[in-house]
């Protein structure tokens, strides 16, 4: 494993790896120890007490963060008829039908989120092997398969983020940029925390919020004290 640079080592020395910080302290420290020479993303990782091998303990969804993520999302919408105009007026970057299916099959990926109306899923389904591994396949659980394309596009543009528990029960998400005020990052953190708390499967036993960490792109991780987290 490659040794971290001097700048990282200096930043990491400011974080007590044996200590668990309050959400406010963790975010403040993560901002202070950002080593990137650009406006880095502030990321969170929630390790949940779930068994993702069980169908009733799958956690997946989407949430609109009150202050957005600071990242501009390019939205592709698959729709027909009036829904094309609706998507365009809502601010979608690309809107079309089978023409975009062919374009993607040829290697085009200049988009970040895909939305589709239910009547287009027959066509979009052809892209499962391409979009699936990239986490771009539209899904009703995240609100990206819907007839209300206006709402879907507007929410994505406003800062909607998708979340999904990985095999180890870890949910990764971006809650903003280092340039954000600490208060805004805390608001975004709490919004995601509340959504995950409400998503706790009834069959999940034991401690739910096992561990939480805040970090920035290329920065050191800061452990969060979860003892006050409510379900």
From Swiss-Prot:
GO BP annotations, alphabetical order: regulation of translation; translation
Annotated GO MF terms: rRNA binding; structural constituent of ribosome; tRNA binding
UniProt keyword terms in alphabetical order: Repressor, Ribonucleoprotein, Ribosomal protein, RNA-binding, rRNA-binding, Translation regulation, tRNA-binding
GO cellular component assignments: large ribosomal subunit
S-S bridge residues: none
The keyword rRNA-binding is annotated on this UniProt entry: yes
Record bears the keyword Cytoplasm: no
HAMAP family in the cross-refs: Ribosomal_uL1_B
Family: Belongs to the universal ribosomal protein uL1 family.
Xref: PANTHER family: 54S RIBOSOMAL PROTEIN L1, MITOCHONDRIAL (PTHR36427), LARGE RIBOSOMAL SUBUNIT PROTEIN UL1M (PTHR36427:SF3)
Subunit structure: Part of the 50S ribosomal subunit.
Described function: Binds directly to 23S rRNA. The L1 stalk is quite mobile in the ribosome, and is involved in E site tRNA release.
Protein name, as recorded: Large ribosomal subunit protein uL1
């Amino acid at each position: 494993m490659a040794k971290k640079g001097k700048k990282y080592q200096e930043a990491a020395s400011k974080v007590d790896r044996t200590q668990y910080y309050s959400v406010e302290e963790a975010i403040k420290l993560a901002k202070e120890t950002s080593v990137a020479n650009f406006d880095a993303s502030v990321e969170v990782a929630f390790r949940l007490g779930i068994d993702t091998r069980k169908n009733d303990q799958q956690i997946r969804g989407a949430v609109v963060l009150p202050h957005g993520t600071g990242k501009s999302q390019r939205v592709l919408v698959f729709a027909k008829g009036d829904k094309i105009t609706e998507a365009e007026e809502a601010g979608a970057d690309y809107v079309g039908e089978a023409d975009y299916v062919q374009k993607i099959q040829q290697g085009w990926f200049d988009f970040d989120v895909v939305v589709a109306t239910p009547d287009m899923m027959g066509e979009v389904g052809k892209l499962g092997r391409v979009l699936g591994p990239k986490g771009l396949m539209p899904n009703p659980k995240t609100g990206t398969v819907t007839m209300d394309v206006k709402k879907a596009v507007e929410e994505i543009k406003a800062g909607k983020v998708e979340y999904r528990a990985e095999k180890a029960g870890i949910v990764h998400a971006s809650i903003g940029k280092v340039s954000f005020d600490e208060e805004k990052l805390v608001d975004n953190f709490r919004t995601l925390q509340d959504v995950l708390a409400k998503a706790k499967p009834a069959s999940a036993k034991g401690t739910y919020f096992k561990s939480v960490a805040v970090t920035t792109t290329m920065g050191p991780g800061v452990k969060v004290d979860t003892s006050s987290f409510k379900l």
